[in-house]
């Protein structure tokens, strides 16, 4: 995953499509899910003919399977990294969270796999999964109707006085400072 800043500009054509080691195209938007278009890499598949059109890529069943397989493999690898070394995964989260968040909101199957390793970060720099965070704030951040109240800041520096006021009431404050 390349490092992405909050004001990122999408750079496409970083993934090249090959068929039996023969270059086909670097326009792979119909093969690779949108949320993974910023990745760099090579796809080589014997199932894609050498002479391929955009309409073929859009309608071919094997191309759809490749797209689903890519999504599954990325989610499985991220899940493996999370389970294997959570601290290291947390260090990488700032670089990969935009991919994961975009994937979660744009691809239901990716969401099903990613919901267990997607992280939330609070203003103290601590990371939680959504389930962990719900448990953490359940006792102190529930309204009169027993709904959880999520307090967040988009800029810790500019909103410090609000953050301190929330912390004085024993609220935990999430830091949601990304574009998603």
Sequence positions of predicted segments:
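Conserved GHKL (Bergerat-fold) ATPase module
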Residues: 1-180
């Amino acid at each position: 995953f390349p490092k992405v800043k909050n004001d990122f500009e999408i750079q496409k054509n970083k993934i090249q499509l090959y068929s039996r080691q023969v270059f086909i195209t670097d326009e792979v938007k119909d093969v690779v899910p949108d949320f993974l278009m910023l990745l760099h890499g090579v796809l080589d598949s014997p199932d894609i003919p050498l002479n391929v059109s955009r309409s073929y890529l859009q309608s071919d069943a094997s191309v759809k399977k490749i797209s689903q397989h890519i999504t599954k493999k990325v989610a499985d690898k991220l899940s493996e990294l999370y389970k294997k070394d959570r601290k290291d995964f947390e260090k990488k989260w700032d670089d990969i969270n935009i991919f994961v968040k975009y994937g979660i909101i744009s691809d239901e199957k990716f969401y099903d796999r990613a919901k267990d390793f997607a992280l939330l970060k609070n203003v103290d720099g601590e990371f939680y999964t959504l389930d962990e965070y719900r448990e953490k704030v359940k006792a102190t951040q529930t309204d009169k109707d027993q709904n959880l109240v999520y307090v967040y800041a988009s800029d810790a520096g500019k909103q410090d006085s609000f953050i301190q006021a929330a912390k004085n009431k024993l609220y935990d404050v999430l830091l949601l400072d990304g574009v998603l």
